[in-house]
């Protein structure tokens, strides 16, 4: 089994180190007829169709009737400039160095980085007038998923598996572990997480579906009954491992979902679902005896949004809940700002913006205790309003 446990690269420079590049200027407006938006993907996504940001950018370009192109690898930003791109988006933090270098040298072209900041030649964070940032708070949903999983486990062991060791992936792994720690603190439990150490900021990553499957099988053998694969298209390996385990208690928290993978419930349907909840949970939940409570806030937060039936069927393994990170609105904003000649900005993808979602629990909803449901609802509301801030070493 080819495993690799690596330390994710953490940008530790403080916000005080941000400086403005004197030679940069805000690029002028670019009419849609002459604009060209482009995705610069890492070598981890040589096929742009497997990169969620590139896919979202292509869709936004189509909606705006603007030309689109993509390229992968460290040389992608420079080649896209030569190709006449007027907006170039680096799709993950591993592209930060090459995007930053190219942006500094081409002030008339707009750039954007997803989940990372621009840097100067020495690697210090820098603010560029032609550089926007997409600030991805996928960690918010991952934190909630960690808390929920801790309340649903029957073995007391959970696991996470990363794919590309970029900031967005690492932040989700860290936040999931934080959510578990929060549950332990609140309930006096000692539920553990395999695959991530939020003291050392090290985790277990995999390059292929086969590696994900091998890691998932290993974690299942160590007692993990809820596994979170954060490996993009390679998540399928975790589904295969769960299916092969043939253990009905082993479930997945699925990732890589967009809004196109969801279905919505009406308020009446959500309330009907709430009425049949048993108030029972897994052995580790520490929940009180079943009781009838007002779960409308929980319904508002989670029950209206579910993973679509056909998506669950395609996954082919039991899915407890899902983490949605949808970049569509953020890409629309980047294109609108570029064509209008607006100043560079920071574009949020978060619970509050609607770009980050923890889905409902489907058939597992009756197994959530009233205490767990209301706790999740309360935390989600606090996160959206800023009362609870989920921070990781990998934040922009």
Model-derived regions, located:
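Bacterial N-terminal signal peptides that target proteins for export
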Residues: 1-10
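C-terminal motif of bacterial Sec signal peptides marking the signal peptidase cleavage site
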Residues: 19-22
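A residue-level marker of the well-folded mature domains of exported/periplasmic proteins
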Residues: 24-396
């Amino acid at each position: 089994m080819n495993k690799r446990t690596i330390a994710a690269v953490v940008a530790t420079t403080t916000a005080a180190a941000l400086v403005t590049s004197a030679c940069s200027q805000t690029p002028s407006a670019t009419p849609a007829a002459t604009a060209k938006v482009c995705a610069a993907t890492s070598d981890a996504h040589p096929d742009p169709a497997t990169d969620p940001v590139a896919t979202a950018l292509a869709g936004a370009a189509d909606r705006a009737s603007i030309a689109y192109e993509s390229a992968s690898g460290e040389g992608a930003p420079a080649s896209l400039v030569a190709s006449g791109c007027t907006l170039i988006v680096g799709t993950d933090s591993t592209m930060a160095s090459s995007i930053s270098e190219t942006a500094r040298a081409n002030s008339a072209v707009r750039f954007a980085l997803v989940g990372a900041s621009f840097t100067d030649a020495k690697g210090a964070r820098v603010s560029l007038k032609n550089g926007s940032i997409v600030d991805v708070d996928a960690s918010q949903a991952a934190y909630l998923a960690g808390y929920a999983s801790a309340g649903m486990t029957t073995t007391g062991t959970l696991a996470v598996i990363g794919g590309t060791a970029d900031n967005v992936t690492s932040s989700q792994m860290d936040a999931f572990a934080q959510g578990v720690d929060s549950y332990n603190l609140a309930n006096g439990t000692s539920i553990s997480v395999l695959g991530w150490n939020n003291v050392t900021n090290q985790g277990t990553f995999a390059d292929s579906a086969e590696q994900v499957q091998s890691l998932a099988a290993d974690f299942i053998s160590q007692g993990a009954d809820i596994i979170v694969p954060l490996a993009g298209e390679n998540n399928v390996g975790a589904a295969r491992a769960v299916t092969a385990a043939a253990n009905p208690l082993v479930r997945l928290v699925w990732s890589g979902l967009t809004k196109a993978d969801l279905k919505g419930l009406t308020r009446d349907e959500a309330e009907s679902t709430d009425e049949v909840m048993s108030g029972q949970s897994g052995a580790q939940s520490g929940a009180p005896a079943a009781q009838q409570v007002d779960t409308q806030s929980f319904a508002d937060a989670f029950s209206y949004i579910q993973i679509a039936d056909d998506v669950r069927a395609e996954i082919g393994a039991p899915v407890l809940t899902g983490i949605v990170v949808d970049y569509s609105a953020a890409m629309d904003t980047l294109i609108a700002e570029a064509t209008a000649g607006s100043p560079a900005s920071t574009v949020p993808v978060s619970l509050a913006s609607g770009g980050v979602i923890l889905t409902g629990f489907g058939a597992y909803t009756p197994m959530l205790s009233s205490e767990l449901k209301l706790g999740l609802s309360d935390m989600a509301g606090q996160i959206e309003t800023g009362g609870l801030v989920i921070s990781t070493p990998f934040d922009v």
